[in-house]
Regions:
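C-terminal substrate-binding/catalytic lobe of Rossmann-fold NAD(P)-dependent oxidoreductases
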Residues: 1-7, 15-16, 93-100, 104-232
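N-terminal Rossmann-like NAD(P) cofactor-binding subdomain of oxidoreductases
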Residues: 1-123, 127-129, 148, 222-225, ...
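NAD(P)-dependent Rossmann-like dehydrogenase/reductase catalytic/cofactor-binding core
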Residues: 216-264
């Protein structure tokens, strides 16, 4: 971190392990410098002085800030899937169940016994079962902000034997008068004109193939067979819309450039 103080930079994207970004920020602003900083770690996601960088949901919070906290990859997948329902007042008081699956790159670059090829190939496993994953408080905080009431998440992450991509199956209970067509219309209206959110037509399902190597989140909506019960399938590439691509999108916003620059 000390080496950064000798470099005058206009912008910096920090892709460091959790707990290491704060020292680098201090070095970057040493001597009165004020660069644009996007932090991909979890260090500043709960800091009110940092803009929470999921612009499809938080554009109204952006007011020229030069510090952006990138959302977590699981978090972005879940929030994009639930935001329209939250805004419409359709999130339940009870828990929302999220069954999440991620490619191995979501576990980081350091090999472990559980992420080694021999452990992952031909296998499917859970980890951080319960309320343990660090993205759970982040999801709950943002959903409470959008819905106006506390939201509890039951979240189970799984490790997929693929290199990249996240697929979340989300079980949503709304007021019984909400129909699948009404839910789809709500999502269609919310994401109209968003270049990086794709809402599939009813009857189609989201797959990793829709999003791998793109900065796009693809969402499909399904009936669970009873009034007000729905299944949402949300997918994105954890290395792009869930990390580096989202950082570029945020950097574009901070410099007044088209959000899609470098990402199409």
């Amino acid at each position: 971190a000390s080496e950064l103080a000798s470099h005058a930079v206009d912008a910096c994207i920090l892709a460091l392990p959790n707990g290491h970004a704060a020292a680098c920020v201090d070095s970057l602003v040493a001597g009165g410098a004020d660069p644009v900083i996007v932090d991909l770690s979890a260090d500043h996601r709960f800091d009110d002085d940092w803009y929470y960088g999921l612009p499809e949901l938080t554009r109204d919070r952006y007011d020229g800030q030069k510090r952006i906290a990138n959302p977590g990859c699981y978090t972005a997948t879940a929030l994009l899937a639930l935001y329209p329902a939250a805004r419409a007042g359709w999130l339940p008081d009870g828990p929302v169940i999220i069954d999440a699956k991620s490619g191995v790159s979501g576990a980081g670059v350091k090999p472990t016994d559980t992420t080694h090829f021999c452990s992952v190939h031909g296998n499917l496993s859970t980890y951080n079962v319960g309320h343990k994953h660090r993205h759970v408080p982040e999801i709950e905080q943002e959903l409470a902000e959008y819905s106006g009431h506390a939201c509890r998440i039951v979240f189970t992450p799984h490790l997929l034997p693929v290199s990249r991509g996240i697929l979340e199956t989300i079980y949503l209970t709304t007021p019984p008068e909400v129909t699948l067509e009404a839910l789809h219309a709500c999502y269609s209206s919310q994401y109209a004109g968003e270049p990086f959110v794709q809402l599939l037509p009813l009857g189609q399902g989201s797959t990793l193939a829709h999003v791998v190597n793109t900065n796009r989140c693809t969402i499909s909506l399904h009936s669970a067979g009873a009034p007000g019960e729905f299944i949402i399938v949300s997918v994105l590439d954890n290395l792009l819309k869930g990390a580096g691509g989202q950082a570029v999108q945020n950097m574009n916003i901070m410099f007044g450039l088209p959000e899609t620059m470098g990402l199409e």
